[in-house]
């Protein structure tokens, strides 16, 4: 598995968790969107919309 593919898988897994947090009302959409952008940046991925 290449490093890029590994990072994409990790990012998509974190995106799933963020979407669950949004669905369950754990945090505001604004905070979760910021977290999503930062996760994408740190993994070198293009952010996917919530």
PLM segments and residue spans:
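Acidic, Ser/Pro/Thr-rich low-complexity regulatory regions
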Residues: 1-50
């Amino acid at each position: 598995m290449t490093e890029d593919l590994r990072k994409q898988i990790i990012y998509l897994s974190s995106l799933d968790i963020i979407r669950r947090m949004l669905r369950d009302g754990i945090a505001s959409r604004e905070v979760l969107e910021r977290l999503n952008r930062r996760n994408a940046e740190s993994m070198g991925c293009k952010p996917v919309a919530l």
